[in-house]
């Protein structure tokens, strides 16, 4: 049960991305029907946004003080988006990759901002038919966001492992728990951030990238975690979109606790050589194996459950406050995350005698059901 009492922790926000599907065949929609985007803007206001493909949209939250507020907002937003989509012959699906969609069918958004992305990144952008979960946590002005970033960075593969929801690509098993992150790796500036010591160094780095023509704007630094370019937050970007809202809330709470611990600790992060040596391997383990990965932590090889327990023990009680439900839910996620569940259901459906396409369609139906699953009591 999520504690609905307002805690005094860090304020945060959540962004969820969705695929738009044709309701008849559950494949990605070629384009949004006339009037659909306008209806979404009217219903969701500033919290609704288009994405880089015409078959994608995003819901971005207001600022929350606790997880119960986030649950109420996103629960209602998911329901409203589903209702609006149904009225236009669509379905809205929140998941890292669509299990059987062909990325070559997706139409790029012609808006100028997205057109520049496709011009700059070419086929890399065209292939990136993926949905993510982004979490913003507010950083007080008295703290340096890059120092906080370097401290939470080593824990991020654990959050990816918990969120992994993209084991399929184009109707085939990808062999990865998070194929989305493999696609992210094709982009520049989208994986592990460099070991910049503080925000002054970060601003100098951005200036160099702009002056050299590598980026058009600061927002084109898309690391797995980054200082936001428009609000005073640290933005988590590593996680796959979560079919179950409860999983997204869990990840937001865990990230919030880790940021809170970094703010309380105030210690300098580990040296970049030691950090990168284990971080790269742990990132691969999370991408490939998810919660079944073997992780290098403090000179030892541990499983995801041990790593989660270490992360929680490290957090001061003040950092844990208001996030206890997230830790409890994460323990359950370790038993079966979305990638595990999708693979198991696909195998079971094939064992029942369904063909590959029929099994994949049924899997999408079940993911759509998960998107609107009732939350634990709040």
From Swiss-Prot:
GO molecular function, one term: glutamate-cysteine ligase activity
Source superkingdom: Bacteria
Biological processes per GO annotation: modified amino acid biosynthetic process
Chemical reaction(s) catalysed: L-cysteine + L-glutamate + ATP = gamma-L-glutamyl-L-cysteine + ADP + phosphate + H(+)
Top EC group: ligase
Coiled-coil parts of chain: none
PANTHER family according to UniProt: GLUTAMATE--CYSTEINE LIGASE 2-RELATED
Described function: ATP-dependent carboxylate-amine ligase which exhibits weak glutamate--cysteine ligase activity.
This protein's name: Putative glutamate--cysteine ligase 2
């Amino acid at each position: 049960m999520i504690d609905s009492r307002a805690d005094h922790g860090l304020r945060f926000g959540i962004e969820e991305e969705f695929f738009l599907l044709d309701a008849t065949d559950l494949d990605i929609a070629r384009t949004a029907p006339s009037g659909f985007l306008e209806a979404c803007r009217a219903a969701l206001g500033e919290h609704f946004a288009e994405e880089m493909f015409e078959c994608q949209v995003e819901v971005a939250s207001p600022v929350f003080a606790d997880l119960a507020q986030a649950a109420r907002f996103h629960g209602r937003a998911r329901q409203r988006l589903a209702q609006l989509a149904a009225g236009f012959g669509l379905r809205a699906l929140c998941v890292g990759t669509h299990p059987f969609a062909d990325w070559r069918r997706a139409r790029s958004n012609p808006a100028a901002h997205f057109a520049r992305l496709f011009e700059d990144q070419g086929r890399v952008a065209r292939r990136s038919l993926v949905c993510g979960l982004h979490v913003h946590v507010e950083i007080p002005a008295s703290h340096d966001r890059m120092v906080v970033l370097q401290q939470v960075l080593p824990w991020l593969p654990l959050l990816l492992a918990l969120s992994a929801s993209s084991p399929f690509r184009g109707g085939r098993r990808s062999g990865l728990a998070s194929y989305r992150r493999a696609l992210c790796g094709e982009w520049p500036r989208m994986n592990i951030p460099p070991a910049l010591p503080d925000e002054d160094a970060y601003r100098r780095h951005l200036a160099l990238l702009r002056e050299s023509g590598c980026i058009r704007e600061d927002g084109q630094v898309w690391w797995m975690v980054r200082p936001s370019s428009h609000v005073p937050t640290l933005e988590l970007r590593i996680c796959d979109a979560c079919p179950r809202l409860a999983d997204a809330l869990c990840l937001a709470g865990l990230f919030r606790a880790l940021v809170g611990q970094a703010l309380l600790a105030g210690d300098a992060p580990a040296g970049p050589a030691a950090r990168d040596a284990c971080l790269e391997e742990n990132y691969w383990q999370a991408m490939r194996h998810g919660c079944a990965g073997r992780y290098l932590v403090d000179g030892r090889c541990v499983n995801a459950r041990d790593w989660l327990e270490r992360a929680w023990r490290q957090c001061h009680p003040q950092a844990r406050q208001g996030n206890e439900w997230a830790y409890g839910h994460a323990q359950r996620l370790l038993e079966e995350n979305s990638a595990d569940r999708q693979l198991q259901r696909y195998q079971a459906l094939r064992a029942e005698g369904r063909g590959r396409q029929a099994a994949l369609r049924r899997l999408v139906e079940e993911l759509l059901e998960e998107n609107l699953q009732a939350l634990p009591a709040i």
